[in-house]
Amino acid sequence: MKKIVVAIIIFASIAVVAFARQHDQGVEVVLPAKVSKEDMSGSIFSRPDMVEMERYGTNTLDVVTLMSSDGKFASGVYKAGKHRAEYTVEEPYGVDEFLYMVEGKMTLTSADDTVQEIGKGDAVTIPREWAGVIDTDGFLQLWVIYSEDGSGLE
């Protein structure tokens, strides 16, 4: 038992020294991006990096919680009021996006007239090639986007 304790102490000491060396060499520590319950209750929109803009004829609030180092993948929280957005085969959705609806709902009507209702607690993944119409009275959602060339995240 004593040997195990000594081995753990030695291992922990080596790990601490290695971490300290990385820190001294300017290696950036990368952390996961957490969105807390408090954030989701609205405090996230008080962050200094929150972007407020007019989009689709309504006021929107958007906070990016993570941007990948290559600029092609991101996640965040988005709030929008009532609006309608239309996408065509010639000008489709443009990004691969996963959405989790925290509040509100939206209706997705695809180009073939297939209708999907996405409400509180539902999730949907919209492919970049999607064509159709989004109708909503407003929502709060968590989003994750992949954009092959990064242009959809600008």
Model-derived regions, located:
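Hydrophobic membrane-insertion alpha-helices, especially the h-region
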Residues: A7-A18
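Short, conserved beta-strand element in jelly-roll/cupin
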Residues: P92-L108
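Loop/turn positions that initiate beta-strands
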Residues: G121-D122
